[in-house]
Amino acid sequence: MQLTTTPGIDGKRITRYCGVVAGEAVLGANIFKDLFAGIRDLVGGRSGTYEKELQRARDIALEELQQRAHDLGANAVVGIDIDYEVLGKENGMLMVSASGTAVIVE
């Protein structure tokens, strides 16, 4: 299945719009990971821990989006938008949502 942030796919023609699809992932932050990330930020390094969690959440959201598109009979999703939110008490949760339009392309 093709996934793209653009409204179409070069060289392909959209023959049917199947509907809007979305996928979400909400992950809790571990206090030890947060502490380590804070120390890394203080010394100017990148937080690999947070980057891995963001990647994992994004992958889950896109997998859900793809499955929902497949369930509608689509073979592509166009116009994908990915949003990130920090939620919960003391910002202890990370939510990634992905949405787009499921289509059939030829």
Curated annotation (Swiss-Prot):
Record lineage: Bacteria, Pseudomonadati, Pseudomonadota, Betaproteobacteria, Nitrosomonadales
Matches recorded under Gene3D superfamilies: Hypothetical protein apc22750. Chain B
UniProt superkingdom: Bacteria
Similarity annotation: Belongs to the UPF0145 family.
Protein name listed in UniProt: UPF0145 protein Nmul_A0734
InterPro entries: UPF0145_dom_sf (IPR035439), UPF0145_YbjQ-like (IPR002765)
